Design a protein with these regions (language model features):
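Short, low-complexity disordered leader/linker segments with a strong preference
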Residues: 1-31, 326-327
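Short, glycine-/small- and polar/acidic-enriched structural segments
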Residues: 25-163, 186, 201-203
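A bilobed periplasmic-binding-protein/Venus flytrap-type ligand-binding module shared by bacterial periplasmic
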Residues: 47-48, 114-125, 217-236, 287
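Short, solvent-exposed loop/beta-turn-alpha elements that line the ligand-binding surface or hinge
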Residues: 53-59, 131, 207-216, 283-292
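Short, high-confidence coil segments that cap the C-terminus of an alpha-helix
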Residues: 81, 178-179, 302
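Pocket-lining segment of extracytoplasmic ligand-binding domains
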Residues: 89-90, 98, 169-261
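Secondary-structure end/capping motifs
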Residues: 230-305
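Conserved C-terminal helix/tail region of periplasmic/extracytoplasmic solute-binding proteins
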Residues: 296, 300-327
């Protein structure tokens, strides 16, 4: 009997050890330095930021918000930030530099934020831009490439594009003459319409893209992580992804609370404007295969327009971190 008891205890101990062996070691809490570009790209982050400040998350966070994406590129290269929310094409450019301090994309944080705004009648689609002049910013960058792609897909060959250096210049043109046709990013599009009741949203370039792109999406912003940090703190990155997904979801489920935080953190000065603009700002958190499908097709369009816009080539599969957030 004693021998049987000893054997049973030994088997129980062995099973316990095997069960424990299957569980990965729990990674200690990490300190994450997150950099974000001021605007729609950082709107989906505000609920996560507040949760971190309230001590509700496992890891500790330091947040930096800038107005120039090149600052974030420099910070990534120097190892001064671990995770950054940057324009999609900039992520491709940085990846294609093939430096030791490489990056991977972990999610798409912002979809399309470009809107056609005008007071003119009869403008409700890309096709309606035939024979018209459109004012916009971003010559030689993604706004131009995106609009030209949509015009090409619609068979429009006689739309003139007039470029201005700042969105505020385009907004001023609309204020002076509401019959002008403009393409503006959020939140400038919402601000222009709030300030001038004669203006209206004619159509969303993002929705127009979805209708003709065959599965890709118009991607404004992505979240990248330094590979070195990902290798050292894989569980912390997964926890960030889960928290970011929750934060983006809350932007939809609690728009008022999110708008309050957007104003609190200085992304948009006035809370009512933030509340009105938020649903139009493409806040999202696409991960895994959905992220890759959305982003790859978009970068291919940019590559065909100007290879330099994505760093000379469409990034290979190593660009995409395909793990999905775990709750």
């Amino acid at each position: 009997m004693k021998r049987i008891i000893v054997i049973l205890l030994a088997l129980l101990l062995l099973l316990t050890c095997l069960a424990c062996a299957k569980k990965p070691a729990q990674e200690a809490a990490a300190a994450l330095r997150v950099g974000a570009l001021k605007g729609p790209t950082s709107m989906g982050l505000v609920n996560l930021r507040k949760a971190a400040e309230n001590g509700e998350l496992t890891d500790t966070y330091t947040f930096t918000m800038v107005t120039d994406a090149s600052e974030l590129a420099a910070s990534l290269a120097a190892g001064d930030v671990d995770i950054a929310l940057i324009p999609a094409n900039l992520a491709a450019v940085l990846y294609n530099k093939k430096t030791e301090k490489g990056i991977e994309v972990i999610d798409v944080n912002t979809l399309g934020v470009l809107y056609c705004v005008t007071g003119a009648e009869g403008i409700s689609s890309v096709q309606d831009l035939a024979g018209k002049t459109v004012y916009l910013t971003g010559q030689g960058t993604t706004p131009e490439y995106s609009l030209r792609y949509l015009l090409d897909q619609a068979g429009v060959t006689d739309c003139a594009l007039e470029f201005k250096s700042e969105a505020t210049e385009v907004a001023a043109l609309l204020a002076a003459d509401p019959s002008c046709i403009a393409v503006l990013p959020q939140p400038f599009a919402t601000v222009a319409m709030v300030q001038n009741g004669d203006l209206k949203e004619a159509f969303s370039l993002s929705e127009s893209w979805d209708a003709v792109s065959g599965g890709s999406r118009m991607v404004t912003g992505v979240t990248v992580v330094r590979k070195a940090f990902l290798q050292e703190h894989p569980q912390a990155v997964e926890r960030f992804l889960a928290a970011h997904a929750d934060s983006a979801a809350k932007a939809a489920s609690d728009a008022a609370g999110t708008a309050k935080l957007i104003a609190e953190y200085g992304i948009i000065e006035k809370e009512p404007v933030a509340l009105k603009a938020l649903p139009k700002c493409g806040v999202s958190c696409l991960t895994g295969a959905e992220m890759e499908s959305a982003l790859k097709g978009y970068l291919e369009v940019l590559f065909r327009a100007d290879p330099a816009s994505v760093g000379g080539e469409v990034p290979d599969s190593g660009f995409y971190h395909l793990s999905s957030p775990q709750g």
